[in-house]
From Swiss-Prot:
The lineage of its organism: Bacteria, Pseudomonadati, Pseudomonadota, Gammaproteobacteria, Enterobacterales. This is Peptide deformylase. GO terms for molecular function: metal ion binding; peptide deformylase activity. Removes the formyl group from the N-terminal Met of newly synthesized proteins. Requires at least a dipeptide for an efficient rate of reaction. N-terminal L-methionine is a prerequisite for activity but the enzyme has broad specificity at other positions. The keyword Hydrolase applies. Binds 1 Fe(2+) ion.
Length: 169
């Protein structure tokens, strides 16, 4: 397993729409393992393949405190959503920035697991929010897209400054 490089805004590769996975095979399972390794190394709770420049419909999530409840979503589809909620969201592709984003309180999805088996999942709370956030990535959407143009610009400037400082270090 290896840690992959996470793309940061304003990288346009984050805006690419991911393609469906045609076959869950050893290569896809390796990508899933690398994505978990990357997510844990970056201290995230979710990661979409597009964030690591792999433009396939793959998401990994672990919202558990002990980091031992791995969820793999391959080719996820939103079946239902209900209610309204929102929390301050962050994103590994938008480091050190957070903003309140409106989300559905509950979701029902269909996806394939890491072995290619189909399943359905009903989620609420943080898991539902994380699923929606990561599914947005698969269609090239970021949490800042829900914000005003002024807030988007401020966040972009902060991230670009942070990346410049990190490049010098």
């Amino acid at each position: 397993m290896s840690v992959l490089q996470v793309l940061h805004i304003p990288d346009e590769r984050l805006r690419k729409v991911a393609k469906p996975v045609e076959e869950v095979n050893a290569e896809i399972q390796r990508i899933v393992d690398d994505m978990f390794e990357t997510m844990y190394a970056e201290e995230g709770i979710g990661l979409a393949a597009t964030q690591v420049d792999i433009h396939q419909r793959i998401i990994v999530i672990d919202v558990s405190e002990n980091r031992d409840e791995r969820l793999v979503l391959i080719n996820p589809e939103l079946l239902e959503k209900s209610g309204e909620t929102g929390i301050e969201e962050g994103c590994l592709s938008i480091p050190e920035q957070r903003a309140l984003v409106p989300r559905a309180e509950k979701v029902k999805i269909r996806a394939l697991d890491r072995n290619g088996n189909p399943f359905e999942l009903e989620a609420d709370g943080l898991l539902a929010i994380c699923i929606q956030h990561e599914m947005d990535h698969l269609v090239g959407k970021l949490f800042i897209d829900y914000l005003s143009p002024l807030k988007q610009q401020r966040i972009r400037q902060k991230v670009e400054k942070l990346d410049r400082l990190n490049a010098r270090a």
